[in-house]
A protein has these predicted regions:
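Short N-terminal or domain-adjacent regulatory/targeting segments
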Residues: 75-97, 177-198, 229-232
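Long, contiguous interaction/targeting segments characteristic
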Residues: 38-75, 80-149
Length: 293
């Protein structure tokens, strides 16, 4: 059958040209953008890191490490692209256990997810399936601390700024916001304490705690793990984001800050070395545009 003599073939060709070829072109653009983003990420300065390994001082149950779900590659549920390829990158990340870190999932939203609503269920189900422990990212201070049931959170002497309330943000910190949409500026003697709970599975304890901040001067941080083991940190001044990483079975962590001038606090991440970590980034009234501000 000649193509020009068959309306069905012409229609099929037109469908192929306008659908599959366009989809292939779109995937090339996405892959190109991904490679570009990876190159940009590699060119950024690495966050300065201090580690504290105290696992032998704080005995606890063995961490839940990553296990690949049975049939993960065959039983993928297509969500948007209606193709089993849609979740390939996620599954590759899950099976790349040698990376030494969990697969991190950020859930951004407005008041609909405040207090870990929805994300608590998502985190629990993913950690049931894929392993991992910990509640993920928690700001040093938050106006929602009393309403969040997935972590016991107390703090004092912090000034909290929300990217949605730009009129209230001092000019000196307008360019310091984190993806969470909050920054926390400490006063002298500021404190923060987080403690795991049994309200949900897998969040009573984690294998790692990360303190994320920028220390432009000479702030001192006294960190206490499980109300028993303490250490004073004096990170070097830097304009870049810094981390203090505590490798231990962490049920609770307390932080006290002194010489706080020039310190910008973001938060503490409680997670494991494998599995899945789900971060809740809720900003009341956020339409999604806060990411671009």
């Amino acid at each position: 059958i000649k193509q020009e003599e068959s309306p069905e073939l012409l229609e099929a060709d037109q469908y192929f040209d306008t659908t599959f070829l366009n989809e292939a072109a779109a995937m090339k653009v996405i892959d190109s953008a991904t490679r570009s983003a990876e190159r940009d990420t590699l060119s950024l300065p690495e966050a300065k890191l201090e580690e504290w390994n105290i696992a032998t001082d704080t005995p606890a149950a063995a961490p839940i490490l990553l296990t690949k779900p049975a049939g993960a590659d065959q039983n993928v549920v297509p969500i948007e692209l209606f193709s089993p390829d849609a979740m390939m990158r996620f599954n590759r990340a899950l099976t790349r256990g040698a990376a030494g870190r969990p697969v991190r999932i950020a859930v951004l939203g407005d008041s609909f997810i405040e207090g870990d609503i929805i994300t608590a269920d998502l985190r629990e189900q993913l950690q049931n399936l894929c392993g991992g422990r910990g509640v993920g990212f928690v700001p040093f201070a938050s106006p929602l601390a009393k309403f969040r049931g997935t972590v016991l959170h107390s703090f004092s002497n912090w000034d909290i700024y929300n990217i949605r309330d730009r009129a209230q943000i001092p000019a000196a910190i307008k360019d310091r916001f984190f993806v969470s949409g909050f920054v926390c500026i400490p006063q002298e003697g500021a404190t923060t304490r987080l403690q795991g709970v049994t309200f949900r599975k897998h969040i009573n304890q984690a294998g790692t705690a990360r303190l994320v901040f920028t220390n432009r001067n000479n702030t001192r941080l006294n960190v206490v793990i499980n109300d028993s083991v303490s250490r004073l940190f004096a990170p070097e001044p830097s304009e870049h984001v810094q981390q203090i990483v505590i490798n231990a079975p962490v049920h609770s962590i307390s932080v006290t800050l002194n010489r706080t001038d020039g310190f910008t606090g973001y938060g503490i991440v409680l997670e494991d070395a494998g599995g899945v970590s789900v971060d809740n980034y809720s900003i009341r009234g956020n339409s999604g545009m806060a990411l671009f501000e």
